[in-house]
């Protein structure tokens, strides 16, 4: 059980990547689905069995700002489930998709309250903030799987609107305050990822 207890929440980014690769390399989608599903259940087990440490980790800025990758992963995960066993799988898949959206919207609200409206510090701004504010566009990318493109457009609009202020804020932070801890430097690669997400929606 130590494996579950010590499981870093940052693994949710890996889960998102695995599910995404399954959509790109369709001939290996089953393999990616199985690996990603196992990791999802490990994260859920940590939430259930080690709830206090789980929530304590999320009480910090960096883990919370990156945890949106879990809600995004759930949205992609739901698209794998939908075709499996009709019609039950469709209902379950839609439920997971909605849960993913609710989790992500909750992250936006909590993160904004804790780190934007209160305790704001420009040096605590990282590219991972885009996971919080632009990650909701994953709902737009996956909405067509449920014939809900009209609702997906709303989530795309939310992400697109939030893109501009976060672009200015994040860019200003990196240009003006160049001192960044080594462990937080890799977040800069998120620049490419989330503009790609917006392009995929258009």
Language-model region placement:
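N-terminal signal-anchor module of multipass membrane proteins
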Residues: 1-49
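A generic, well-ordered mixed alpha/beta core segment in the N-terminal half of proteins
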Residues: 79-115
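Early transmembrane hairpin module of multi-pass membrane proteins
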Residues: 28-39, 49-68, 92
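Hydrophobic, membrane-facing alpha-helical anchors
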Residues: 40-56, 100-117, 162-174
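Helix-coil boundary and interhelical linker segments in multi-pass alpha-helical membrane proteins
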Residues: 22-29, 81-92, 141-153, 202
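Juxtamembrane helix-loop boundaries in multi-pass membrane proteins
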Residues: 1-20, 52-79, 97, 113-141, ...
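Conserved helix-loop functional segments at active or binding sites
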Residues: 83, 145, 170-173, 177, ...
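Structural signature of hydrophobic alpha-helical transmembrane segments
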Residues: 29-41, 90-105, 150-165
């Amino acid at each position: 059980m130590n494996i579950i207890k010590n499981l870093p929440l940052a693994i949710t980014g890996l889960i998102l990547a695995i599910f995404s690769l399954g959509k790109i390399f369709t001939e290996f989608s089953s393999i990616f689905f199985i690996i990603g599903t196992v990791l999802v259940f490990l994260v859920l087990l940590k939430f259930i069995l080690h709830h206090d440490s789980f929530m304590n980790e999320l009480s910090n800025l960096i883990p919370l700002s990156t945890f949106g990758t879990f809600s995004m992963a759930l949205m992609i995960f739901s698209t794998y489930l939908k075709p499996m066993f009709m019609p039950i799988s469709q209902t379950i898949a839609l439920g997971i998709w909605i849960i993913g959206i609710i989790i992500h919207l909750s992250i936006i609200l909590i993160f904004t309250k804790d780190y934007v409206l209160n305790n704001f510090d420009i040096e605590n701004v990282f590219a991972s903030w885009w996971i919080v504010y632009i990650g909701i566009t994953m709902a737009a990318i996956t909405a067509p799987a449920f014939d809900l493109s009209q609702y997906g457009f709303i989530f795309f609009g939310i992400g697109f609107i939030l893109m501009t202020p976060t672009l200015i804020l994040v860019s200003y932070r990196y240009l003006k305050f160049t001192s960044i801890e080594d462990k937080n430097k890799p977040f800069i690669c998120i620049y490419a990822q989330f503009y790609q997400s917006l392009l995929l929606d258009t």
